């Protein structure tokens, strides 16, 4: 792996960017000119640009609402056909890599928990690959006869976020039906080790698992089918990517987006590096993964780092914030029961309590920490079906 050179990449794509964004100045810009003259697009800037596009756009669109990681409702528009620039279309990305092929029979799990926008765009994308698509709907209403019906059509692909894929597996097994799934395509969040284990236990070690990195505003940005599923190949013909401080910014290089993105801040951070002529993203995470505890800002990363230093390995954790009956703030850190014994749980609890900004709350006798073992499948998820990292119930 070598470092990503934004100056060099800008030189490669500046003419394309000038055409897509109808700004001839871009052709003569150096990358530093681009940074200086083009402001970063935030959520408000995206909304304003969307309104301008609505005023002049004659094509009909799908309107999708998504809560985002923040929980705030935001509106996005998508072209119905998903095929604007054929050479870089979403469907070609999936077809050319063999993720979804003609004749595949795909279960669209984005209809679980009201994923309306992803439901339609994923259905259209899979359809354009030549695949057949069935929308599963609310998994709590799916019975044994429904799973038998899915078996009868030779269902072989699952499309969804990790938690909805696990919901499907749990319901399938509860109803005593086995479906021979050959491929699992996940997006929306990273695939945890325990989730991957459950998928392989359900469908066999040979099942193909593909991860898709994307955003509501930009669509599909990258993909991974590496064994670790943490190294995403970025679609550098679709977007120009920058790293400004810790922030990831993207600029559209095709006409696929209803709202063209120009230095749009995703709210993610990642490590950018090159392998040959391909750009890869690793260590993708949200920029702000922290919480306020007794006046101190505690990053989720420092807790994860403390656990790794204590045990010599990483764990998937979930943090709950609450208030005790004595009106003291309580930080409860859930760790995987299958990965941690009682002795290790105590060691983790002691180590977290010794984090300086947390220890201060102990010294004031105003806060406390508890570490509990829990089945990772019982970790709380959001209304969108994503695993929550920090849950604040102090109100």
UniProtKB/Swiss-Prot annotation:
One of its GO terms (molecular function) is indoleacetate-lysine synthetase activity. Its EC number is 6.3.2.20. It catalyses: (indol-3-yl)acetate + L-lysine + ATP = N(6)-[(indole-3-yl)acetyl]-L-lysine + ADP + phosphate + H(+). PROSITE patterns: AMP_BINDING (PS00455). Keywords: ATP-binding, Auxin biosynthesis, Ligase, Nucleotide-binding, Plasmid. InterPro entries: AMP-binding_CS (IPR020845), AMP-dep_synth/lig_dom (IPR000873), ANL_N_sf (IPR042099), CapK_Type1_Caps_Biosynth (IPR053158). GO terms for biological process: auxin biosynthetic process. Belongs to the ATP-dependent AMP-binding enzyme family. PANTHER family: CAPSULAR POLYSACCHARIDE BIOSYNTHESIS PROTEIN. Conversion of IAA to IAA-lysine. This is Indoleacetate--lysine synthetase.
């Amino acid at each position: 792996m070598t470092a990503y050179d934004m100056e060099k990449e800008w030189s490669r794509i500046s003419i394309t960017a000038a055409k897509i964004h109808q700004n001839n100045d871009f052709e003569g810009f150096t990358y530093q000119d681009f940074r200086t003259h083009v402001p970063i697009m935030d959520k408000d800037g995206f909304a304003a640009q969307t309104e301008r596009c609505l005023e002049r756009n004659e094509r009909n669109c799908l309107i999708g609402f998504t809560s985002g990681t923040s929980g705030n409702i935001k509106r996005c528009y998508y072209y119905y056909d998903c095929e604007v620039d054929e050479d870089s279309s979403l469907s070609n990305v999936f077809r050319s890599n063999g993720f979804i092929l003609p004749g595949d029979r795909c279960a669209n799990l984005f209809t679980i928990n009201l994923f309306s926008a992803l439901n339609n765009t994923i259905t259209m994308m899979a359809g354009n690959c030549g695949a057949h698509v069935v929308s599963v709907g609310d998994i709590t209403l799916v019975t044994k006869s429904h799973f038998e019906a899915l078996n009868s059509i030779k269902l072989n692909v699952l499309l969804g976020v990790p938690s909805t894929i696990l919901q499907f597996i749990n319901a399938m097994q509860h109803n005593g039906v086995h479906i021979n799934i050959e491929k699992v395509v996940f997006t929306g969040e990273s695939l945890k080790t325990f989730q991957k284990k459950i998928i392989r236990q359900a469908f066999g070690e040979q099942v193909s698992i593909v991860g898709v990195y994307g955003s509501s505003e930009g669509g599909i940005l990258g993909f991974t089918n590496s064994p670790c599923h943490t190294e995403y190949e970025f679609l550098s013909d679709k977007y120009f990517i920058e790293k400004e401080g810790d922030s990831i910014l993207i600029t559209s290089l095709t006409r696929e987006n209803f709202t063209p993105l120009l230095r749009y801040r995703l709210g993610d951070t990642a490590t950018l590096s090159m392998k040959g002529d391909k750009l890869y993203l690793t260590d993708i995470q949200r920029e702000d993964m922290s919480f306020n505890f007794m006046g101190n800002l505690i990053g989720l990363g420092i807790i994860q780092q403390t656990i790794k230093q204590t045990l010599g390995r990483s764990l998937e954790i979930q943090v709950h914030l609450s208030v005790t009956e004595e009106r003291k703030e309580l930080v409860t850190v859930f760790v995987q029961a299958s990965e941690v014994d009682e002795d290790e749980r105590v060691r983790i609890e002691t180590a977290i309590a010794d984090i300086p900004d947390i220890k201060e709350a102990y010294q004031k006798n105003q806060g406390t920490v508890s570490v509990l073992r829990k089945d990772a499948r019982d970790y709380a998820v959001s209304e969108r079906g994503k695993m929550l990292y920090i849950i604040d119930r102090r109100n």
